[in-house]
Amino acid sequence: MNGVINIYKNTGMTSFDVVAMVRRVAKMKKVGHTGTLDPAASGVLPVCLGKATKIIDYIMENKKVYRVNLKLGMVTDTYDLEGEVLREEDASHITKDEILNCINSFVGTIDQVPPMYSALKQNGVRLYELARQGIEVHREARKITIYSIENIKIESNDNIQMDVCCSKGTYIRSLCYDIGEKLNVGATMTALERIQNGTFTKEEAINIEDLTEELLEKHIISIEKALDSFEKITVNEKFGKLLRNGVKVFDNRMYSEEVEFNKLYRVYEDNGVFLGLGKRDEKGFKLEKLLIEE
């Protein structure tokens, strides 16, 4: 069985728990998820089976949409409710307009410092392992992109909800923390749900608790379909043969569409055969991942 199943992970489970359950149902070992969701978070977790494990890294590049709840006036060491409260502030004076203006100021490409409680490594040691020892180290800010923040609901300063569309590598806990710091009262993430990963949506996801062999076979998505978030280009069979053989082709006649530099595309021959994912640079166009079904 080769393909991707759109799974909904419940709170309290690790992402590896989901993989283990899919392995049991599918009766196969070659299974992997496409981006960790913390146990306290829920939501969309595409799981790749068989040859589809080759495209895990590409699905992880997708834009993600998270539904997040945060509380103003409280800061924890983990930036969420799992951690120890470090400080509390009175946030009752913060107005809705101030909150909205602050939240919207984070839209765009920004520098974000990852939290200490994260799986990133420093000198070979995971940051959360250092944090558990009470050690805090300097973390370099990383460029991330917040594409949009929509559906902002301010029920009270204790409960603000918003939908955040962001790039790979974004820490929503850090976003909440940074919003709180900018408002000078602190903030903590209180709930997190991933509602979309590229073309994989919450509405179409299968709850991991409901997964059966029959549901898996019915809803598994082909490798080709799972890459729908990448734009499509078509080449003729002559150039297709060169690409299949790993040749980098420098010839603008090979594609009819406008092809940007350093951008991944789904590549098809003009007879409809899906070849894989390719990228153009100054020296030509080459398949980065050959995915043709033999």
Swiss-Prot record:
EC number of this enzyme: 5.4.99.25
One Pfam family per UniProt: TruB_C_2
Positions in coiled-coil regions: none
InterPro entries hit by this protein: PsdUridine_synth_cat_dom_sf, PsdUridine_synth_N, tRNA_psdUridine_synth_TruB, TruB_C
Protein's UniProt keywords contain tRNA processing: yes
Catalytic site positions: 38
Keyword Flavoprotein: no
Protein name per Swiss-Prot or TrEMBL: tRNA pseudouridine synthase B
